[in-house]
A protein has these predicted regions:
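Rossmann-like dinucleotide-binding domain that binds NAD(P)(H)
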Residues: 103-172
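Short, solvent-exposed loop/turn and secondary-structure capping segments
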Residues: 6-11, 31-32, 58-59, 86-91, ...
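Structural recognition of the beta-strand scaffold that forms the well-ordered cores
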Residues: 19-21, 27, 45-48, 74-78, ...
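Core domains of carbohydrate- and sulfate-ester-processing enzymes
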Residues: 77-119
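Beta-strand-loop-alpha-helix segment that lines the small-molecule cofactor/substrate pocket
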Residues: 2, 6-54, 68
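Basic phosphate/pyrophosphate-binding loop/patch that engages nucleotide-derived ligands
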Residues: 37-44, 60-75, 93-96
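Active-site-proximal cap/loop segments of hydrolase catalytic domains
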Residues: 29-32, 38, 58, 119-122, ...
Length: 172
């Protein structure tokens, strides 16, 4: 889960390893700063998992954008409509499943009772473990935009969000 990325990556580079870390690199700006500092300190190669960069249709699209055939690009907007999200029903806390070492799964996250909603895939929708759709899918949309413009940082950012659907479900 995302909440482990910082600790695992720092431990790995401290052990002299090069690292492939899945996106998002960290759960906070501070975690990302710690990770970048560790990679520099231990002179490790670190790659962040942006899998779409390896897809041929993505490379073809970037080649087209970079060809100049679109003219001068003045504005880039990135968004995603997610039609696969489903309501997460409220469930009571439960016993930890057999074979799961829940304390190790929690790791650096705050200690909370086990709840099936905050485990496996759905951990993404709980702040203790991840950053919701922005860090799960938004990082890819921003990556497309930045590569398309051949920049590493945006000039400005505007974001809007909220819990507009399923107001009574269990997601945070």
């Amino acid at each position: 889960p995302d909440h482990w990325h910082c600790m695992q990556m720092v431990d790995a580079v401290a052990a002299g390893k090069d690292v492939y870390v899945e996106k998002p690199i960290g759960n906070s700006i501070r975690e990302c700063e710690i990770m970048v500092a560790a990679a520099k300190k231990y002179k490790s190669v670190v790659q962040v998992g942006q899998w779409q960069r390896s897809q041929q249709h993505f490379r073809d699209a970037m080649d087209f954008v970079h060809s100049g055939k679109l003219g001068k690009i003045r504005l880039v907007k990135a968004w995603a409509y997610q039609g696969w999200m489903k309501r997460i029903p409220v469930q009571a806390d439960a016993n930890v499943p057999t074979g799961v070492h829940y304390d190790k799964w929690l790791g650096p996250a705050p200690k909370r009772a086990f709840n099936p909603n905050r485990f496996h895939f759905n951990f993404r929708w709980y702040w203790d473990y991840a950053g919701g759709l922005m860090t799960d899918w938004g990082v890819h949309m921003l990556d497309y935009a930045l590569i398309g413009m051949k920049v590493s940082d945006p000039v400005s950012v505007m974001a809007a969000g909220g819990k507009f659907a399923y107001p009574d479900d269990a997601a945070e």
